[in-house]
Amino acid sequence: MPLAPPVGVVIANHNNCAFVEKAIESVARQTVRDLQVVVVDDASPDRSDEAIRRCLARLGDARFRYVKLGTNLGQAGALRRGMTELDTPFVCFLDSDDLWYDDFVARHLAVHMNADFPVALTYCDSHIIDADDRILAGTAWWFDSDKPQAKARRTIAPALTPTIDPASGELTYPRNDGVTFHPQWSPAGATNTTASMMFRRAFVDLVLVPPSHELRLYVDFYLSTFAGLMTGTIAIHEALYGYRMHGGNSHSNATVPGGAYNSANREWEPIRSYVLKMVQRVLRDEAETLRLTFGEERHSIAERLMADAVGELPIGRAAPAKARLPELLLGLLGDGLSRLGPRDRS
């Protein structure tokens, strides 16, 4: 019988000394054992280096390697550096303040191996947890938020409600085997955070081409948009990880007021526009390669969808990304620090 392929993991860290050990340990506990794992510290000024070295020494796991950067590269740069250490057809990126549940890799890899259609990206739902690993919400409301029933009055199935151990307080959720194939990107849709995703490595190598200084954050939004445009995506309808909201996140705040709440600590629309325009530029600049790989029709549809979302690109010139940024967003993406390639895009 055929064997499952190995999976690569990059844990990119910046200033998360309080949580990075839990992230590393969650990868070590994965039921799939054929892993290559790289922990990248993105020049953290806190005690992250000490925490990472202590954790790796305690584990004594030969699958783990450690790279400490002397200069902060941001999220894209740190992830690229980590990927240079990997030789796997699939890759995942775990934010160092989040944690995976034990079957995260197994569930994603099984869905990627489906006998229906191969995609570049699978992503899953998440629990929202606090700094002490306590669950604040049983789902990320934005996960697959374009589904028709998202805003409908409805009965919530008992299978979506956990049992609570009265002695320990431990929550147990029933297993949810549901998966959904999304054949095309939609501006109304959403996936989930970086830690929810498993990518085909060849796809990441193909499209993660913007210079690192232009993509210091929001690599998840960039890659998931590209995956939806070029290959389609598959959603796994079970929370397979804990997305931690602790008050010091690069993007999110620490509150869950309920409803379709805004989890960001800054305005989303300028960020969304910036990243989509970056996708649009790469569709143009890498057109020959993308057409050869995915076909003329798929590329043309992607260009049209981006034009509908953010407008047409200027004809005959490529304006520098920073020149189009409002001052607030320039500060965020130009100087922001990562939580968290074969080509040198620094």
Model-derived features with residue positions:
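Membrane-interface aromatic/basic loop that binds lipid-linked glycans or pyrophosphate carriers
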Residues: M1, R284-S346
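Nucleotide-sugar donor-binding/catalytic module of glycosyltransferases
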Residues: M1-G258
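Short secondary-structure transition/capping segments
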Residues: G82-E85, A140-F143, I164-G178, S263-E267, ...
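General helical structural elements
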Residues: M83-T84, V204-D205, G248, L276, ...
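Short flexible/disordered coil segments
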Residues: D98, I129-D130, Q184-F199, A254-T255, ...
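Catalytic core of nucleotide-sugar-dependent glycosyltransferases
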Residues: Y241-G247, S252-R291
